[in-house]
Amino acid sequence: MSEKPQQEEQEKPQSRRNSFAVIEFTPEVLDRCLKQVEFYFSEFNFPYDRFLRTTAEKNDGWVPISTIATFNRMKKYRPVDKVIEALRSSEILEVSADGENVKRRVPLDLTAARNARIEQNQRTLAVMNFPHEDVEASQIPELQENLEAFFKKLGEINQVRLRRDHRNKKFNGTVLVEFKTIPECEAFLKSYSNDDESNEILSYEGKKLSVLTKKQFDLQREASKSKNFSGRSRSFNGHKKKNLPKFPKNKKKNGKEESKEDSSAIADDDEEHKE
């Protein structure tokens, strides 16, 4: 009787937490690896990447390479020693003497970078309604590459950012596409905007897509938040009943108790859902 549990324990598969598939680091692969990390530290990403920026600020600009290696798009580059080898060839980045950390050779002017955000938004479109219901977290890196290839056929772009649901962190079917120039962005919008029925239909895997400016997307998102969390509608979508704010009761009037909304509870709840 005592042998069976022991046998089952021996047959239990080993953890794959630290396992990886070794890839051949050809010159092309080394170059892609380097460009990916340089992008993380670029003016297009670093000022807006809170995690990366705060990590660097705490360490005089340095970020552990082991941390960067955990990013989804970097997990395929193993062993990490090859990543370090690629980074040592960078003209933008500097690797520490012990090979443990990396930082920009010339720090970014974050104030100027933040001021450039307005211009960046003018070059950015939101493309919505991508198939996403069956997309697992493990499929995100491959999907990212596929969507980048999809948009590169349609215009000159800097980056494609997949939006995620703040509750489950899964891809929500919307991507933000940043074009290299405002004219490129405007040309794409003119060709595929849903405002003009004569425009060409933009689709992906047979599904019609919707195209909005970044400003339209932000306004739509704020309107959705207001609808879901305003005191007037009190819908609180996605919340269990036990998590709803409790409103203090007023004195009885005409034999009935009236409730008064606690606006601070609603504001706190809305703040919790900011991305």
Swiss-Prot record:
Residue list for modification N-acetylserine: S2
Main location: nucleus
Record's keyword annotation contains rRNA processing: no
Pfam families to which the protein is assigned, alphabetical: La, RRM_1
Subcellular location as annotated: Nucleus
Molecular function terms, GO-annotated: mRNA binding; RNA binding; tRNA binding; U6 snRNA binding
RRM domain location: 123-216
Name the record gives this protein: La protein homolog
